[in-house]
Amino acid sequence: MFDYLENEEVALDELKQMLRDRDPNDTRNQFKNNALHAYLFNEHCNNVEVVKLLLDSGTNPLHKNWRQLTPLGEYTNSRHGKVNKDIAMVLLEATGYSNINDFNIFTYMKSKNVDIDLIKVLVEHGFDFSVKCEKHHSVIENYVMTDDPVPEIIDLFIENGCSVIYEDEDDEYGYAYEEYHSQNDDYQPRNCGTVLHLYIISHLYSESDSRSCVNPEVVKCLINHGINPSSIDKNYCTALQYYIKSSHIDIDIVKLLMKGIDNTAYSYIDDLTCCTRGIMADYLNSDYRYNKDVDLDLVKLFLENGKPHGIMCSIVPLWRNDKETISLILKTMNSDVLQHILIEYITFSDIDISLVEYMLEYGAVVNKEAIHGYFKNINIDSYTMKYLLKKEGGDAVNHLDDGEIPIGHLCKSNYGRYNFYTDTYRQGFRDMSYACPILSTINFCLPYLKDINMIDKRGETLLHKAVRYNKQSLVSLLLESGSDVNIRSNNGYTCIAIAINESRNIELLNMLLCHKPTLDCVIDSLREISNIVDNAYAIKQCIRYAMIIDDCISSKIPESISKHYNDYIDICNQELNEMKKIIVGGNTMFSLIFTDHGAKIIHRYANNPELRAYYESKQNKIYTWKYMILFPNAIVKHNKIHKNIESVDDNTYISNLPYTIKYKIFEQQ
């Protein structure tokens, strides 16, 4: 009988005959099945009368077989294409619904005939809808992944214990999933995202004749039950970001899924692919889009609800591979949006001038904001700067950018040392070729600058910034271009003080001192030095320079410094006084070494015994650097002039002039 029930088309009369001498509750078979188990396992079990007969014959509807399944559990666990509602009801009624939780809701949902009335019966008699399947999906999660979920059944599930608002079990604060991104940075989203994610993903490539496409009514139903469409999954994707990959995109569904998303053009870099991702970025990228052609109405919708930076990030990576589509998109934008996108592009991206040209063609302009943006771009290059300044006219460099000097952005350290120095410079040699990208860019911009000493909101000049960021080549360029070393910032800081306190760069300090700051500037700088012990060498350089200007400055030097360096000041005084006593050709040794006029004429006295004796004595300890450089150069120049005089042909006009006149003629060359 059991074999018959399990494998044959069961006839009532034949079964009645068998039941006369067989016990339907005989469970001595290997599977411990009773007669109900055997019949309900039969793939042809569609006759409710057979079930009623077995029950009337005393078959126990609560007996559990080797799989610990009652007949109802066996029936709803079997791989039947359909679950017969009448059979299920008979089995439930036979136990007074005590076996209701033996009903396998997950298998039932996969059948082709889910009956809302049967679901209502389960609800009415207390079925536990909080149960989860082997894959840890809830009832509602499984149901939305079926072929054609019905909103009314979704309502029943949710209203009777199926939650669609998740809480992380490990989160002691119980933040709902939808609150993750804005309120709890430590919260990790569930792998599958929301129920809305599951529904969209499972119906992306559905064909209407076998499996339904995404149904707007289902989407509305889920949203109405509190699912936030802006929620993201572990891949940081919203449901909309998946939906735009669908084989059939309904713009009304797109609008539903946009709710709560304040920027449909938001973008991010995918960790695995290093590609720019996001709703708009994915849709424009043919690698993520199902359909070949772009729907411009859909793109316009994204543009209307997207922010310029995200739009820029979405279209720029695709420019080189799909110029036609991107140019078409640019053409559809209004000029205000396009202008914002141009500024974002110039500020944050590696510039392709051909893309800029397209933007300009469709209504954008290179204005002051665009130029200011490019000065902040870490991918700056002189060629693009030339192009942009010529388009704008160059006046933008003369206007502060939120209180900052535009060119000053290039002085900052985030542009990298390589932008200012070549390998030669790193090895100790100055690079003054301006071939370095940032330096050459600044060099190109300077002619547009009406006042190289323009100040920012802190009262600082470009020179202040170049010194602060230790850009020696740039400092040299600015000094050669007329930057004033004497300007004080709003807090009283000079470039000299910055070189000592912040840059701690003696070479920079000497460059500044060589451009002859005023005595007041040097004294003010000394007052600003924060550590008079650790900065001893720098302080001595300043004192040495200041005493050349005025050897009576000891009273002006801050008392803390003058006390600490009193012996050094005395030695400076002694050496300077000695140089002032030595007379060479009507000039003091001091004036020949430390004045501009002296530097121009010192070569005339290259053979002067007193000058040579002073040079060869090397008696100075402090003021040696100047004459140790000047005097050898003076000898070389003198010898060159003398050689030129000797080479003049006899019996010429010049040859007949006195030697002193000939000397003055040739020293001009």
Curated annotation (Swiss-Prot):
Protein name stated in the entry: Ankyrin repeat domain-containing protein OPG023
Statement: the UniProt record of this protein carries the keyword Aminoacyl-tRNA synthetase: no
Organism expressing this protein natively: Cowpox virus
Subunit text: Interacts (via N-terminus) with host RELA. Interacts (via PRANC/F-box-like domain) with the SKP1 component of the host SCF ubiquitin ligase complex.
One Pfam family hit: Ank_2
Region (PRANC/F-box-like): 586-667
Gene3D superfamilies xrefs: Ankyrin repeat-containing domain
Swiss-Prot/TrEMBL GO biological process terms: symbiont-mediated perturbation of host cell cycle progression; symbiont-mediated perturbation of host ubiquitin-like protein modification; symbiont-mediated suppression of host NF-kappaB cascade
Gene of this entry: PG023
InterPro entries: Ankyrin_rpt, Ankyrin_rpt-contain_sf
PROSITE patterns, A to Z: ANK_REP_REGION, ANK_REPEAT
Top-level taxon of origin: Viruses
